[in-house]
Design a protein with these regions (language model features):
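Pre-active-site segment of Zn-dependent metallo-hydrolases
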Residues: 65-108, 143-147, 153
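N-terminal juxtadomain amphipathic helix
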Residues: 3-71
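Metallo-beta-lactamase
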Residues: 2-23, 30-33, 47-61, 83-92, 121-173, 214-229, ...
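Short beta-strand micro-motifs in enzyme catalytic cores
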Residues: 4, 62-64, 75-79, 173-175
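Active-site metal-binding motif and surrounding structural segment of the metallo-beta-lactamase
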Residues: 93-133, 234
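Short, ordered loop/turn segments at secondary-structure junctions
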Residues: 114, 136, 241
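Short amphipathic alpha-helical segments
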Residues: 98, 121-124, 145, 202-203, ...
Length: 266
């Protein structure tokens, strides 16, 4: 009988197959996540899929989002763009996989930071592809696999249309993706939650820890702003439903960094 690869209920990270659940989830024990009042809890992919379904929406021409309803764990979505699967969700059912493949097939999965590693190995096996993670976050890989490839440095081209950029902030290896053909060839920033789109979609914010509300220091915001200033993009798409900026995205992100710095200096 095959062993279950247990999944953390709080963060959605999947661990290697085992007879019993792990004793702890290091990702949730880190101050950028949390262990809930009920303590460490575990589930399986089959249980995640029971009573849940894939939510699929086109965000702009050539960009499709796939999420989970009802939500699970952190609740992020994955974005599919011209052969790239950006970020990952835990749910892997036939409809979710079909939606990803229908969006053009996948040549690589790239993930912004460890909170969204989720069931990346299962997805990579299902899609017969590789997973690209920044080497600065290697300690947070809870399920090692030959399909997981680490990249180093500040930028990595993925095909003709995408570039991974190490932005840092939330995690040392925190990565954003620039899709050159997005926003009618003006460029699109796939931001995860390293750049968190605010409720009015006119501003964004940045955090070291979202659940524990720990801000980033001014020196890190200044460094991130310098990186963002070098990028070309018009639209921004974040990790969660509704976190989409259709126009003037770069100006809004830079203005938000300035506002953040001003608040820290008061």
């Amino acid at each position: 009988m095959p062993l279950d690869a247990f999944v953390c209920v709080t963060c959605g990270t999947q661990y290697p197959p085992s007879l019993t659940p792990p004793d702890r989830c290091p990702i949730c024990l880190d101050e950028r996540q949390y262990v809930g009042h009920e303590g460490q809890r575990w589930t399986t992919l089959a249980e995640v899929a029971s009573g849940r379904a894939a939510r699929i929406e086109e965000l702009e021409p050539g960009l499709v989002a796939v999420g989970t309803e009802p939500g699970f764990a952190i609740g992020q979505r994955t974005l599919i763009s011209h052969g790239l699967m950006w970020d990952c969700i835990t749910l892997l059912d036939d409809r979710a996989a079909a939606a990803v493949q229908a969006a053009g097939g996948i040549s690589a999965i790239a993930i912004s930071h460890p909170h969204y590693y989720s069931s990346m190995v299962e997805w990579a096996e299902r899609l017969d592809t590789r997973v690209l993670l920044h080497e600065a976050d290697r300690e947070w890989i809870m399920r090692p696999d030959p399909r997981v490839e680490l990249w180093a440095g500040e930028r990595l081209r993925v095909g003709d249309e995408h570039e991974l950029v190490r932005l840092g902030g939330h995690f040392d290896g925190g990565t954003v993706c620039v899709w050159r053909a997005g926003a009618s060839e003006q460029g699109c920033l796939l931001a995860g939650d390293l750049v968190q789109v605010a409720a009015d979609r006119d501003w964004v914010s940045f955090m070291y820890s979202y659940p524990n509300m720990i801000p980033l220091p001014a020196r890190e915001i200044r460094r991130m702003r310098e990186v963002i200033e070098t990028l070309r993009f018009e639209s921004v798409h974040g990790a969660f439903w509704g976190q989409d900026i259709a126009r003037d995205g770069k100006r809004k992100v830079l203005a938000s960094a300035d506002r953040y710095l001003a608040a820290l200096s008061r």
